Amino acid sequence: MGRISLIVAALLMLSAISLVTSRYQSRQLFIELGRSQAEARDLDTNWRRLQLERAELARNARIDRAARDDLKMIPIVPDRTLYMNQPAGGAQ
C-alpha cells in the first residue's frame, strides 16, 4: 500500500507542476497577445497618418505654392515663350 501511495503522490506532484507550467505559459501568451495588439494599433495609426501626409504632399495647391514661393517660378505666358528652331542640317 505504501508503494502505491508514493506513486500516486508523485503523479499528483507532476500533475500540479504541469498545471502551474501551463498556466504560466498561458499568461505569457496573453501578455504577448496584448503587446502585439497594441503594436498593431500603433502601426495602423501610423499608416493612416502616412496616408494623410502623402495626400497632403501630393496636392497641386501645395506644389504650386512651393514652386512660386521657394523656387520663385512664374506661370508661363505665350508672349514670354521663346521657341527655338533647329537648323535644317541637324545638330552638330
From Swiss-Prot:
InterPro entries: Cell_div_FtsL. One of its GO terms (biological process) is FtsZ-dependent cytokinesis. Coiled coil: none annotated. Residues 22-92 are periplasmic. It is found in: Cell inner membrane. Keywords: Cell cycle, Cell division, Cell inner membrane, Cell membrane, Membrane, Transmembrane, Transmembrane helix. Its main location: membrane. Pfam families: FtsL (PF04999). Residues 1-3 are cytoplasmic. One of its GO terms (cellular component) is cell division site. The chain crosses the membrane at residues 4-21. It is a single-pass type II membrane protein. Essential cell division protein. May link together the upstream cell division proteins, which are predominantly cytoplasmic, with the downstream cell division proteins, which are predominantly periplasmic. Part of a complex composed of FtsB, FtsL and FtsQ. Belongs to the FtsL family. This is Cell division protein FtsL. The lineage of its organism: Bacteria, Pseudomonadati, Pseudomonadota, Betaproteobacteria, Burkholderiales.
